[in-house]
């Protein structure tokens, strides 16, 4: 009975109260930029995804209104497709099953739209909304903790919770997400790194230093990014048509298109 009770108590402990499982040392990667596109209007990027030949962006209302923007990957022209106004702080977004899902930060609302951007019944999120992506079957969300949530696209109910581990510790502040090539890529809030996570084990398999993106910016662009501590990297998307990833940040004037390679 005592053994059974001890096991039950361990199950009920919060993630941080138990020792993190062992994971291999992450591989160090570099992002090799193949081209960059300067956008003609800035956005406080909270979600990023390539869909139907364009880069789509969900923004928070840090400097105005929460929006869904469509960015031309050739010219950088930004078109606002949906506007949630100033009452909601837009967060992660993803296209899945002919629908667009957009989370909100602390309002617990998930906006859903059909393929023509017509509103569908909203869903409820019991947690804070941060990053959102999907695999072949489920939505995958983050809430700023060390956990990823695998969710039903029908009602946003939780099917599985995956703790994320790096270097023997749970990795907190997981933010924007992208599922690509069998892995989950994630920004880490207030950190200039990107991580690649195993969706099976939760282990961080690789890390990417993003500071070189800031260093290669034009002086005026770098001045914008350096002007506010909130303007951190946030936004990772994958284009299966070209095989390129797209990286950006909050209020960054530029989108970077490139590939990940082993660090020197």
Where are the regions that the model predicts?
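A short helix->beta-strand "capping" segment at the edge of beta-propeller domains
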Residues: 21-41, 73-76, 220
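Beta-strand-rich domains and repeat architectures in extracellular enzymes and scaffolds
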Residues: 34-67, 82-94, 239, 249-253
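Beta-rich, blade/repeat-based domains predominating
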Residues: 41-52, 86-96, 125-142, 168-182, ...
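Conserved beta-strand positions in repeat-built beta-propeller and related beta-rich domains
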Residues: 57-62, 100-107, 141-145, 186-190, ...
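Short loop/turn segments that connect beta-strands within beta-propeller blades
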Residues: 71-76, 114-118, 153-156, 198-202, ...
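Blade-loop segments of beta-propeller domains
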Residues: 75-113, 117-129
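Hydrophobic, well-structured mid-protein blocks that either form specific transmembrane helices
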Residues: 110-167
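Blade-level signature of beta-propeller repeat domains, shared across WD40, Kelch, NHL, RCC1
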Residues: 237-264
């Amino acid at each position: 009975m005592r053994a059974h009770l001890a096991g039950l108590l361990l199950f009920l402990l919060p993630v941080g109260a138990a020792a993190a499982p062992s994971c291999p040392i992450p591989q160090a990667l570099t992002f090799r930029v193949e081209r960059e596109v300067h956008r003609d209007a800035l956005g406080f990027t909270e979600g990023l995804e390539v869909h139907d030949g364009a880069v789509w962006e969900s923004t928070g209302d840090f400097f105005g209104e929460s929006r869904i923007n469509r960015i031309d990957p050739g010219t950088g022209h930004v078109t606002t497709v949906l506007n949630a106004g100033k009452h909601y702080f837009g967060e992660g977004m993803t296209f899945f099953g002919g629908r667009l899902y957009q989370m909100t930060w602390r309002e617990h609302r998930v906006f859903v739209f059909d393929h023509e951007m017509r509103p569908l019944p909203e869903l409820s999120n019991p947690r804070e909304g941060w990053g959102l992506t999907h695999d072949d079957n489920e939505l995958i969300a983050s809430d700023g903790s060390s956990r990823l949530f695998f969710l039903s696209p029908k009602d946003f109910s939780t099917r599985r919770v995956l703790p994320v581990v790096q270097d023997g510790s749970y990795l907190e502040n997981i933010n924007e997400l992208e599922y690509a090539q069998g892995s989950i890529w994630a920004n880490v809030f207030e950190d200039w790194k990107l991580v690649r996570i195993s969706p099976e084990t939760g282990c961080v398999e690789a890390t990417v230093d993003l500071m070189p993106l800031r260093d290669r910016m034009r002086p005026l662009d770098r001045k914008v990014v350096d002007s506010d501590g909130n303007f951190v990297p946030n936004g990772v998307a994958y284009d299966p048509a070209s095989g390129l990833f797209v990286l950006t940040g909050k209020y960054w004037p530029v989108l970077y298109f490139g590939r990940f390679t082993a660090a020197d």
